[in-house]
């Protein structure tokens, strides 16, 4: 019997990260360390992270796992520098190319889920600018991995807040979406929330998908706390319609 689903996991491979020689893409640092040790140290950390990404993908392939959500911590403090300024950029670029090629050759889907501080819907322009910057970093990472500019290589986020005015927040999200580069716009997806004060799959369909056409990622667990009046099956089927073929 052929399965029509694809199981995977997010960010941390507990098998590899617990070994004596740790394999991980989550090496990071505190701000104090970043300020004290500078870009050369950051460059070394990033090179370790992206090199280990390939090792993790090889383990995944060996264990018949073909879906992997990459860590957003692969590039510590990435908003503070341009990747090209890193001393190891050429090696980092090569490592990402190799990882992306391996993923393609082994039918492994790579995705990301930037953190909750990303709020395209915010009425605060600085918050929006910070969000755009972070999303563009994820878009650049996907490009360096040679991933398709499509939701297959999704950059998945939440709307980010309601600000006591859901229509306003949804309109802001859609307006600010248009400020993103194609590297992000073509990959962006939006996920339902786990609080009734935020956004159900139905609300995302009406307020986001119908306006800008980006696919909805339906979280089964979140839906139990924010149904929007739909059953689980109805919400899943509604989200599926946003993905086309």
Please state what every model-predicted region is.
Residues 113, 219:
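Conserved, mostly hydrophobic/aromatic
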Residues 209-215, 221:
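Active-site segment flanking the S-adenosylmethionine/decSAM binding pocket
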Residues 156, 187-194, 215-217:
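Catalytic beta/alpha-barrel core
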Residues 137, 164-179, 195-199:
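Active-site glycine-rich loop that binds ribose-phosphate moieties when present
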Residues 1-109, 118-132, 136-147, 151, ...:
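Alpha/beta catalytic barrel-like cores
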């Amino acid at each position: 019997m052929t399965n029509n689903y694809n199981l995977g996991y997010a960010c941390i491979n507990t098998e590899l990260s617990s070994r004596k020689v740790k394999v991980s893409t989550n090496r990071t640092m505190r701000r104090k360390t970043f300020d004290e040790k500078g870009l050369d140290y950051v460059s070394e950390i990033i090179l370790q992270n992206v090199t280990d990404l390939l090792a993790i993908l090889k383990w995944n392939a060996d264990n018949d796992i073909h879906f992997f959500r990459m860590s957003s911590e692969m590039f510590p403090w990435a908003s503070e520098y341009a990747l090209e300024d890193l001393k190891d950029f050429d090696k980092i670029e090569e490592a990402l190319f190799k990882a992306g090629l391996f993923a393609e050759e082994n039918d492994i889907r790579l995705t990301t889920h930037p953190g909750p501080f990303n709020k395209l819907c915010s009425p605060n322009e600085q918050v929006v600018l910070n969000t755009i910057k972070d999303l563009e970093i994820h878009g650049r990472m996907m490009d360096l991995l040679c991933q398709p500019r499509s939701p297959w290589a999704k950059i998945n986020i939440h709307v980010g807040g309601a600000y006591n005015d859901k229509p306003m927040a949804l309109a802001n999200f859609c307006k600010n979406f248009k400020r993103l580069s194609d590297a992000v716009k073509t990959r962006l997806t939006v996920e339902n929330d786990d609080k009734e004060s935020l956004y159900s799959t139905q609300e995302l369909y009406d307020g986001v998908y119908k306006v800008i056409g980006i696919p909805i990622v339906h979280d089964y667990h979140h839906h139990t706390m924010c149904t929007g009046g739909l059953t689980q099956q109805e919400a899943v089927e509604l989200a599926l319609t946003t993905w086309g073929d």
